[in-house]
Amino acid sequence: MNFENIQREDKEIYDLIEKELVRQQKGIELIASENIVSPAVMEAMGSYLTNKYAEGYPNKRYYGGCHVVDEIEQIAIDRAKELFGAEHANVQPHSGSQANMAVYFAVLEPGDTVLGMDLSHGGHLTHGSPVNFSGKLFNFVSYGVDKETEMIDYENVRKLAIENKPKLIVAGASAYARILDFPKFREIADEVGALLMVDMAHIAGLVAAGVHPSPVPYSDFVTTTTHKTLRGPRGGLILCKEKYAQILNKNIFPGIQGGPLEHIIAAKAVCFKEALDPSFKTYGENVVENCKELAEQLIARGFKIVSGGTDNHVFLVDLNNKDITGKEAEALLDSVGITVNKNTVPNETRSPFVTSGIRIGTAAITTRGFVKDDMAEIAAVISEAIENRDGDLSALKTRIETLCDKHPLYN
């Protein structure tokens, strides 16, 4: 990207943009919700489309001059439907949280009962956390993982559904490493007369690549972000049955949003086209292969992985046996060039600002070209940093920079 105009007009911001580029180039990104967009996606985000206001939907706008963005938004809609095999797609949500909000507002009334995954067990804020709008407006009942297997206990989900008669069941997670059983969720929803919404924000790219089962055939609504494993711009997407299209669209606009971000919608269209390419399947396969290998390499070095491994792009490391908190590990690894995030683990005893674990994902490093053979070195540096946390870690930082130089970024 050419930032000569920013460099000329605002040197202070330009310098910080360049500083962030160096941070990304010299470090290993293991935050599971992050990825690296293509130059094409980035160019769409910075295009002339940012100048256009376009309240409404294609061919039904409240402003004039929308004939070009109408075409772009329709292309994005059509590509999303093709990519996921959906009957209807809304590409306007500014975020995954707003996608979830729109579905809730479309089918629920304040106080209605909803069944969702507990945040501390791997769910998301918008799945009923009391500090989030979802937990404040609706009566969320939480399910979690089994204490022994650390996997979702579907019989317990069924029991809670029968006891509480939710109007909506929410499946999906932000920190769950196993394949989600969508047919089982559908079966439970049907048994109690509930609607089913799947939040696939973390696994959308894996679903698109065919390496994770699709929730679309089993769900009334599917929400996602476009910037995690899908490798697109920051934004949201909703897929649903055609019979819900009108009420869903009304709850995005004018329900919770005004004008859509047409430059971001264009970038979504580009990312959907990239995900429709056969090479994206290889990418998805490599993400999972790298993740499984990194988990195994850490297990071999004495780390406890929640549920014993992973089936997707993410896993949690329970650090209780390493005598270090998630907060401390996050800062420590950052100092040697590895970026992770602190994360609660099942049956957490510490504050969410401290935590007993870290979350690790391989979507970004796989985009960058890291392969299975690189995982042993990453695991070794993580292990050595934590085991020798009070020593000189400069050699570890050099090892990470050497590894990053093998896989250049935005050169």
Curated annotation (Swiss-Prot):
A single cellular component GO annotation: cytosol
GO MF: glycine hydroxymethyltransferase activity; pyridoxal phosphate binding
Origin: domain of life: Bacteria
Pathway connected to this protein: One-carbon metabolism; tetrahydrofolate interconversion; Amino-acid biosynthesis; glycine biosynthesis; glycine from L-serine: step 1/1
Main location class: cytoplasm
Cystine pairs: none
Residues carrying N6-(pyridoxal phosphate)lysine: 228
Pfam families: SHMT
Keyword Ligase listed: no
Family: Belongs to the SHMT family.
Main function: Catalyzes the reversible interconversion of serine and glycine with tetrahydrofolate (THF) serving as the one-carbon carrier. This reaction serves as the major source of one-carbon groups required for the biosynthesis of purines, thymidylate, methionine, and other important biomolecules. Also exhibits THF-independent aldolase activity toward beta-hydroxyamino acids, producing glycine and aldehydes, via a retro-aldol mechanism.
Descriptive protein name: Serine hydroxymethyltransferase
Species per Swiss-Prot/TrEMBL record: Clostridium beijerinckii (strain ATCC 51743 / NCIMB 8052) (Clostridium acetobutylicum)
Lineage start: Bacteria, Bacillati, Bacillota, Clostridia, Eubacteriales
